[in-house]
Amino acid sequence: GKKINKINELLIPGKLIEVGDATVSTGGAVANTGLAMKILGGNVSLLGKIGNDAFGGIVKGVLKKYEAKDELLISDTEATSYTVVVAAPGIDRIFLHNPGANNAFYAEDIPEEDLKDAALFHFGYPTIMRSMYLNDGDELIKMMKRVKEAGVATSMDLASVDDSSEAGKVNWRHVLERVMPYVDIFVPSVEELCYMLDKERFQEWQERAAECDVTEILDVEKDVKPLADECMKMGAKMLLLKCGVPGMYFCSASKEVLSQISERLELDVDAWAEKEYFEKSYVPERVLSGTGAGDTSIAAFLTAMTDGCTPEEALHLAAGTGASCVAAYDSLSGLKSFEELRKKIDAGWEKVK
């Protein structure tokens, strides 16, 4: 469709807007990151809570289609979480979200059996799961601590917070300070992290960006790095900050700190310690929708890490996956195998300027 510059050109009360076909797909950390890891060759088990309703049936159907091993908990009292994504050409997506059953997910919902052989536990998103952010994140800390003590490496992603909601009143800096010692690989977006650590700075970014995408006006040294440094001080072992179209920022702690990560991950500590990179995005073949680009690039990064790749290669594959994802309307159909991505990268795939 026709590109727009501002959302108020589109959403006007009383106006009828003709739109394209609806794409019904699963989303979020379990379906986007989890299924993408499976497509990219990872051995994954998917865990989440859904309602006994039509949306829950769709979720089960999608996971079945991908032959993914799922351990979905079905609630008779809660509805399946859903999101309406407004993906208009020319602007970032807008999300209308109902957390549903995700609000009632607890640490004890993770089967003990699943933790026995797992190398990595990836979790998202505490920001839109009421059980996880209440009481300064007590349940989140309990869960991450339990997983870590079971000998599993941990990674965590965030989602945007609706400032006017209950989650918007949470002291997120305090929650992050409490949970970070139990997070090995922290993979939020730079805007989400800034909102949590420094609301004033976040406000300033939005004002500076005016109607543009915030990530386009950020300076790595002045804007991104200070936030990354704070996370590392809080106890994160590795940090991958998604910075939108420009790319991703990665940094890691010392060899001594990385050696605390579970041996099941088989991480080459020498290769991964004390690194810092800004990985520019690759130019996509086309841009249809940003849906799932962050989640799937994280999936590629984590899969590459568990495959024994170097940080440089993991970042190339993550950036390549993000660029492949945006070439389709949904999160998964644009994904390419690591083999295809490596060929494309070796052939000189162009980076964004």
Task: Cite the ranges covered by each PLM segment.
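Glycine-rich phosphate/adenosyl-contacting loop at the front of the ribokinase-like
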Residues: G1-L47, A54-K65, G90, D268-K275, ...
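Ribokinase/PfkB-type carbohydrate-kinase core domain
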Residues: K2, A22, G61-E78, V85-P284, ...
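A short acidic Gly-Thr/Ser loop motif
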Residues: G27, K242-V245, G292-G294
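Short glycine/serine/threonine-rich phosphate/pyrophosphate-binding segments
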Residues: A29-N32, F55, A79-Y82, D295-I298
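Short, small-residue alpha-helix embedded
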Residues: L35, G42, C194-L197, Y249, ...
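Structural motif
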Residues: L47-K49, L73
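Amphipathic alpha-helix from the class-I
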Residues: R201, T306-D307, A327
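Short arginine-rich
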Residues: S324-S333
